[in-house]
Amino acid sequence: TIDTCSSDSPLSCQTDNEASCCFNSPGGSLLQTQFWDYDPSDGPSDSWTIHGLWPDNCDGSYQEYCDDSREYSNITSILEAQDRTELLSYMKEYWPDYEGADEDESFWEHEWNKHGTCINTIDPSCYTDYYAQEEVGDFFQQVVDLFKTLDSYTALSDAGITPSEDATYKLSDIEDALAAIHDGYPPYVGCEDGALSQLYYYFNVKGSAIGGTYVASERLEDSNCKGSGIKYPPKSSS
């Protein structure tokens, strides 16, 4: 099991502590990233879907593919071996690959190999009685748990921003609606072809990335959307 950290562990990116199992560094800015996949449509029609959990450096740069020895090509079987069947079925629904279900596994592999291996607080050395790939299951569970606290679809809907073939929206209204579920901090809002496509919610973390305290923080990248006329196309029901 992962070692426990004290509740008064320092907050990442807010002090220059040495990296440790209880201090995320250099990747101290943790981003929970989401997709709105409408072309082709993916995931439930009334929910955004998971992209990942990324450890960005505190200046917005990032490392990637940090540990060749822990790159895996069998995420599904790792989770099954850990009896994480409920997690796996949730991921199939809310963490799908836009190219289709047969690509889900490669998408999950990509997210772990590129980003998960760079989270220093889930290194095997941070575990007691570690067993191989234990941190992989913990990573995917943590991403899902964090995603469940960030219901972007409902936050937008509560502000009157709903998928539509013809309505368009203002960036400031979108940001305000999403800031309401993120302690007043708007996420990065990403557009493609003038339509909503991605969200990045930024956090600093007290303690480990697994089970630590995620504290909403300012985004390190400005939206690439225009100020108004933003489309939010419905997902097709097929």
From Swiss-Prot:
It comes from the Eukaryota. The active site is at H51, E111, H115. The lineage of its organism: Eukaryota, Fungi, Dikarya, Ascomycota, Pezizomycotina. Coiled coil: none annotated. CDD domains: RNase_T2_euk. It is an enzyme of class 4 (lyase). This is Ribonuclease M. This is a base non-specific and adenylic acid preferential ribonuclease. Glycans are attached at N74. GO terms for molecular function: ribonuclease T2 activity; RNA binding. PANTHER family: RIBONUCLEASE T2. It catalyses: a ribonucleotidyl-ribonucleotide-RNA + H2O = a 3'-end 3'-phospho-ribonucleotide-RNA + a 5'-end dephospho-ribonucleoside-RNA + H(+). Pfam families: Ribonuclease_T2 (PF00445). Disulfide bonds join C5-C22, C13-C58, C21-C126, C66-C118, C191-C225. Gene3D superfamilies: Ribonuclease T2-like (3.90.730.10). One of its GO terms (cellular component) is extracellular region. One of its GO terms (biological process) is RNA catabolic process. InterPro entries: Ribonuclease_T2_eukaryotic (IPR033697), RNase_T2-like (IPR001568), RNase_T2-like_sf (IPR036430), RNase_T2_His_AS_1 (IPR018188), RNase_T2_His_AS_2 (IPR033130). Its EC number is 4.6.1.19.
